[in-house]
């Protein structure tokens, strides 16, 4: 009986050891104390706290490095783990191949090269080079002298700032007119956003600009892969919408005007004219407003609660009459009316309202 009890206890102990090995949290690898310098540490399922100086660290998946107050990290290579730069901490010459570099308020990342992954900034990112991946500037965070190369994306959120940006050919900027300040150069010249006004923005390759209510955008170029979104009460004039560029707007915008492949287009005083929607573009015609001679190209969408005439719904485009869905808020209108529509292998859904003189070609409709 005693022997059986011993065997049970041994088995229980082994089970506990196995469970601990399998499910224990990441072990704390090391602490670099004030005044101490370490070189060439590889972090993989380890955590390093840096109060002193850490040089040539490699952070692999599962690894973490925390740069504490007055700590310094130099020439760190991040290959899938995390580097946190805390208040008064500094990271210099980091290379981000995957994973995250997170700059907290009061921290600084200097001359990071971003090949992939995410550099998230609540503090300061100075002179980063964005070759791939995404640099995200959060509220009250900032970046200066950022270079965005082909395949890279700089995102500046409301209340964030990006100064002296060098947007190279193929680089992308995603932002809003509520950013604190954004300025720099692109292949078309100088651009800026400040006090709710955006000038000369170039949107391409995943870049976008959101023009908020009562804000303005002037002379925006929406090239292939770019998106211009104008909210109700927003204004965008001088828009140059090229092939592959996308516009998302409603007839409640104060004014949206410019050129596309059809020539001049405009939305003003509740009337949309000659608006062509490319792949991914969208138009919402609100009640008591109208759209004239709208073209929906492949994968574009149009929702009409008002009146539209001469609408063309091309292959794989979708038109909805009498119903709109705005961020999950669904509205119906029996007053909606569509006249002289041509459906050319696209799809038109009648939820409410009236259709008059419709021409259907192809298999859909």
Regions found by a protein language model. Give the residues of each.
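Bacterial Sec-dependent N-terminal signal peptides
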Residues: 1-26
């Amino acid at each position: 009986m005693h022997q059986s009890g011993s065997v049970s206890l041994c088995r229980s102990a082994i089970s506990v050891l196995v469970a601990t090995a399998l499910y224990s949290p990441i072990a704390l690898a090391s602490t670099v104390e004030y005044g101490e310098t370490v070189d060439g540490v590889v972090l993989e399922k380890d955590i390093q706290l840096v109060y002193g100086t850490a040089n040539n660290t490699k952070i692999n998946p599962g690894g973490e490095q925390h740069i504490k107050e007055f700590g310094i990290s130099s020439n760190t290579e991040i290959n899938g783990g995390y580097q946190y730069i805390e208040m008064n901490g500094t990271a210099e010459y980091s290379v981000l191949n995957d994973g995250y570099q997170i700059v907290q308020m009061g921290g600084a990342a200097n001359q990071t090269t971003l090949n992939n992954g995410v550099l998230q900034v609540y503090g300061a990112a100075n002179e980063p080079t964005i070759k791939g991946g995404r640099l995200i500037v959060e509220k009250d965070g900032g970046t200066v002298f950022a270079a965005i190369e082909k395949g890279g994306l700089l995102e500046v959120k409301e209340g964030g700032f990006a100064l002296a940006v060098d947007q190279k050919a193929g680089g992308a900027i995603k932002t809003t007119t509520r950013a604190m300040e954004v300025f720099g150069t692109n292949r078309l010249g100088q651009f800026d956003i400040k006090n709710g006004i955006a000038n000369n923005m170039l949107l391409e390759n995943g870049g976008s600009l959101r023009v908020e209510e009562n804000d303005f955008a002037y002379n925006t170029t929406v090239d292939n892969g770019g998106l211009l979104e104008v909210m109700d009460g927003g204004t965008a004039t001088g828009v140059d919408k090229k092939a592959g560029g996308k516009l998302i707007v409603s007839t409640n915008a104060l004014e949206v005007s410019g050129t596309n492949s059809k020539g001049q287009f405009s939305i003003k005083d509740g009337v949309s004219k000659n608006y062509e929607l490319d792949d991914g573009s969208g138009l919402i015609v609100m009640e008591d407003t109208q759209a004239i001679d709208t073209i929906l190209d492949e994968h574009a969408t149009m929702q009409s609660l008002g009146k539209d005439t001469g609408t063309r719904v091309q292959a794989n485009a979708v038109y909805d009459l009498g119903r709109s869905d705005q961020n999950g808020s669904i509205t119906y209108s029996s007053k909606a009316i569509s006249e002289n529509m041509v459906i050319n292998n696209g799809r038109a859904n009648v939820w409410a309202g009236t259709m008059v003189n419709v021409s259907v070609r192809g298999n859909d409709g």
